[in-house]
A protein has these predicted regions:
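Thiol-based oxidoreductase modules, predominantly thioredoxin-like and allied folds used
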Residues: 65-87
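Bacterial N-terminal signal peptides that target proteins for export
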Residues: 2-12
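N-terminal leader/targeting and pre-domain segments
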Residues: 24-39, 132-136, 141-151
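Loop/turn elements at helix/coil->beta-strand transitions in domains of secreted/extracellular proteins
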Residues: 39-43, 74-79, 106-110
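Local sequence-structure signature of Cys/Sec-based thiol-disulfide redox active-site neighborhoods
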Residues: 31-64
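Non-catalytic, surface beta->alpha helical segment in thiol-disulfide oxidoreductase systems
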Residues: 102-137
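Structural micro-motif
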Residues: 42, 93-102
Length: 151
């Protein structure tokens, strides 16, 4: 019984990671762009690689965080992009490493890219920055340092 639990637990965790629910059902890049325009929501392109330890960690912690996940489901269209398989899209966005988060506005205009692993508490602030369109008023670092008022 103990051996079965030891074998079953890692298998369940791996299946959960592979089946991580995309908050908005976008089948491909063009579909995600159309969905973002239709719903007037920003688009998050999340580039990952199955062989990337930081990607696995980001999905296990940051993207699995209840607060982050709730914001993504409610306020964003999300497209997970396997950088190893979607080479055209990876080239288009000049992805040189994973994980990488590209944020686009509802019209598809590129806002900014954040490469690397990001902790959940910081990712929530970044999502708020994009959701609230604070990028039109201040740069991201000021928002992170001073908040939405900039003071």
């Amino acid at each position: 019984m103990r051996t079965m639990k030891k074998t079953l637990f890692p298998l369940v965790v791996m299946v959960m990671l592979l089946l991580w629910a995309v908050p908005a059902p976008a089948q491909d890049y063009n579909g995600a762009l159309k969905e973002a325009q239709r719903e007037q929501k920003p688009l998050l392109l999340y580039f990952f690689s199955k062989s990337c330890a930081y990607c696995v960690e980001m999905e296990r912690t940051t993207l699995a965080d209840k607060g982050v996940n709730a914001m993504l489901k409610k306020d964003f269209v999300v497209l997970r992009v396997d950088a190893d398989k979607s080479t055209d899209l990876t080239r288009l966005y000049r992805i040189s490493g994973t994980p990488s988060s590209w944020f686009l506005d509802a019209s598809g205009k590129r806002l900014f890219e954040l490469p690397g692993y990001i902790r959940a508490k910081d990712y929530k602030k970044i999502l708020e920055y994009v959701k609230g369109k604070y990028y039109a008023k201040m740069d991201l670092q000021d928002f992170l340092d001073k908040g939405p008022t900039g003071k």
